[in-house]
A protein has these predicted regions:
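Proline-rich intrinsically disordered, low-complexity coils
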Residues: 2, 114, 141, 178-181, ...
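Primarily a tetratricopeptide repeat
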Residues: 65-66, 107, 145, 180-183, ...
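Compositionally biased alpha-helical segments
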Residues: 1-110, 114-117, 125-137, 141, ...
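Flexible, glycine-rich surface segments
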Residues: 132, 141-200, 206
């Protein structure tokens, strides 16, 4: 059992040394070579905990501000593995992603130093940011190729796979491939149903947007309830899929928010209605 465990207040760190005080009120500063240290455990700062509570409560704007403050406060030790400056910076980027602020994400990533991240899922998330950046730049063919490679890997969490499918859906939509886009957006639901509330909501609205604007759907809406209605047509199938999504929005996907007005009319095309 180790006997040389020390509880200290770390002030700064470099690639070779750590500067610390024995207590927060101590005047004397000491220095120790990192080569002599086996491992470091950080206590969670109160400010980080408060920001995380906002994050879990889906107040991403408030959480982003909180994480930014933690990142700045502890940046003198961001060389150390597992430090809270690096971790706060990661969640600051995540807040920008959940707010769909892709330009803000790009700016934060440009200055981010991820080397001290220790959690494998966080490291994997960094790889997915390349897909989000392709969305930002509307690099659709590259994004299709990128997500092909990503989806072939097994390392992703459900939330991460949902992101990959969502970005892929946007790429297919950008390439005017509506059915492929719908399949990809449906993958978002399958990968992480309602847990990634921002993505599932956005994917649902994307599906409704695509279906409503599809020429086959427009024809099915025109023929609905007439003798020329064709329940076996692609348009009729898409129309009923949209109706089901509208119902699902009210039950779970909407998170308590009303269905946008432009999609309310779809509900009148419910079969047997």
């Amino acid at each position: 059992m180790p006997t040389d465990i020390k509880q200290v207040w770390i002030l700064a760190a470099s690639a070779t040394n750590i500067e610390y005080k024995d207590t927060i009120n101590s005047i004397d500063r000491e220095r120790m070579a990192r080569a002599l240290i086996d491992s470091i455990y950080f206590y969670e700062p109160k400010a980080f905990k408060e920001a995380m509570e906002l994050y879990k409560g889906r107040d991403y704007t408030g959480a982003k501000e909180g994480f930014a403050k933690v990142r700045e406060e502890f940046k003198k030790i961001d060389d150390l593995p597992g430090n809270f400056s690096t971790l706060a910076g990661f969640y600051e980027i995540e807040c920008a992603r959940k707010l769909m602020d892709l330009e803000g994400m790009a700016a934060l990533l440009e200055m981010y130093r991820p080397a001290a991240l220790v959690r494998e899922t966080n490291k994997n998330q960094l790889e997915i940011y390349s897909a989000w950046d392709a969305v930002r730049t509307k690099s659709w063919p590259r994004l299709i190729s990128m997500t092909d490679e990503m989806l072939a890997q097994k390392k992703w969490t459900g939330t991460q796979r949902a992101q990959i499918y969502y970005c892929r859906g946007l790429a297919h939509e950008g390439l005017e491939e509506p059915i492929k886009a719908l399949n990809a957006f449906n993958g978002t639901f399958t990968a992480d149903y309602t847990a990634s509330e921002v993505l599932t909501k956005a994917a649902a609205l994307a599906c409704l947007r695509i279906i409503k604007n599809h020429e086959e759907t427009k024809l099915a809406m025109k023929l609905f309830g007439t003798e020329d209605e064709d329940p076996n047509s692609t348009g009729y199938f898409l129309l009923q899929e949209a109706v089901a999504l509208c119902d699902l929005w009210k039950v779970a996907l909407g998170g308590g928010q009303p269905l946008p007005a432009e999609y309310q009319e779809l509900l009148k095309f419910k079969k047997n209605n």
